[in-house]
């Protein structure tokens, strides 16, 4: 199985999107065409490198996100929200899963995209737009959203059907590669912060407003799904679902009794999601194997750890009561790196490799 449908990507991105937005889309033509050819070449690459000549199933991108978020849970049925930058063309899916069948209720297509919105503001704040969204989420806790929230409410608005739409005049990602924001965005929020500039109160407040607007859209989608499906449970998938702050606040709204989010909920989990979709939705197998633990990575014993410490000439001491000493250090506002047991899967710290 593979986590992208090459034919659908070519149809939606290269033919439909580029054609619909011509001539503005010309700068994206090479990028989208290269990606399309890469995806179309996946089958040959798999067969050549692995000597594999059986069937290869190409799973729609968001079906793979939905599959890992639902089929690893122990829910028999659930509402599902899948949000990322974009798959073949879709950026957000609101769905329900019953009897191992996925029913899509609503979709949002690129360039309207919560993922691209968050990426763009991450870039504006001086961080890597592809990998540093978590830093912006963390930064938001230090800011006050009140000054900028109305600006973000103008940038991304709510639709009555549980979806949203963006004012794309603030952005350039839909027209050019590696160009995220427009002059209108800069005239609204001021100059972009470079990565070596000090983070000021303004940057914290903008991060807080972005985070708040994301949460408002989360609540909007959650309320819609609850009303439409009356499900007790919700599953979250896609890279935006790594926003643990928004996830926690959505749970607190009590639209749903419980929420399941797989640790590798971004594209890193699609190698699990695609075969899960094929197993349950194509082959129609019914036996479920719920997710038991995120701690599936490597672990190292004391001898191995000590050997590494000595190799790098690090100072160390053995503690008689590591929990008490850690509590004291934390109470004194120290930063702790916590390392125990097997490493968790996924990009978020879940207790065994944490700061």
Predicted regions mapped to residue ranges:
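Short acidic/glycine-rich loops and adjacent helix/strand connectors
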Residues: 1-355
């Amino acid at each position: 199985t593979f986590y992208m449908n090459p034919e659908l990507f070519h149809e939606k991105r290269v033919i439909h999107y580029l054609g619909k937005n011509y001539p503005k889309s010309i700068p994206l033509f090479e990028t989208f065409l290269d990606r399309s050819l890469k995806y179309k070449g996946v089958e040959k690459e798999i067969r050549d490198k692995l000597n594999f000549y059986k069937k290869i199933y190409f799973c729609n991108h968001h079906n793979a996100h939905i599959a890992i978020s639902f089929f690893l849970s122990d829910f028999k049925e659930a509402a599902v929200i899948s949000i990322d930058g974009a798959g073949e063309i879709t950026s957000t899916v609101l769905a329900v899963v019953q009897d191992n069948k996925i029913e899509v209720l609503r979709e949002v297509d690129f360039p309207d995209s919560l993922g691209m919105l968050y990426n763009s503001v991450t870039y504006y704040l001086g961080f890597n737009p592809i990998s540093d969204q978590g830093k912006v989420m963390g930064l938001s806790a230090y800011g006050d959203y009140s000054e900028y929230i109305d600006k973000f409410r103008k940038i991304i608005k709510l639709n009555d059907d549980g979806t949203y739409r963006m004012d794309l005049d603030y952005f350039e990602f839909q027209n050019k590669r590696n160009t995220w924001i427009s002059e209108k965005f800069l005239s609204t929020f001021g100059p972009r912060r470079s990565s070596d500039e000090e983070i000021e109160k303004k940057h914290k407040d903008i991060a807080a407003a972005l985070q708040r607007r994301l949460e408002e859209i989360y609540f909007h989608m959650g309320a819609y799904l609850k009303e439409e499906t009356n499900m007790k449970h919700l599953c979250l998938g896609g890279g935006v679902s790594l926003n643990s702050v928004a996830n926690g606040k959505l749970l607190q709204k009590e639209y749903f009794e419980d929420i399941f989010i797989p640790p590798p909920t971004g594209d890193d989990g699609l190698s699990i999601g695609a075969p899960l979709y094929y197993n349950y939705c194509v082959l129609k197998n019914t036996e479920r194997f719920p997710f038991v633990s995120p701690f599936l990575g490597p672990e190292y014993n004391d001898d191995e750890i000590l050997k590494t410490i000595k190799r790098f000439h690090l100072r160390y001491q053995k503690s008689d009561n590591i929990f008490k000493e850690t509590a004291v250090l934390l109470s004194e506002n120290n930063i702790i790196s916590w390392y125990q047991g097997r490493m968790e899967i996924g990009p978020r710290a879940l207790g065994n490799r944490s700061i």
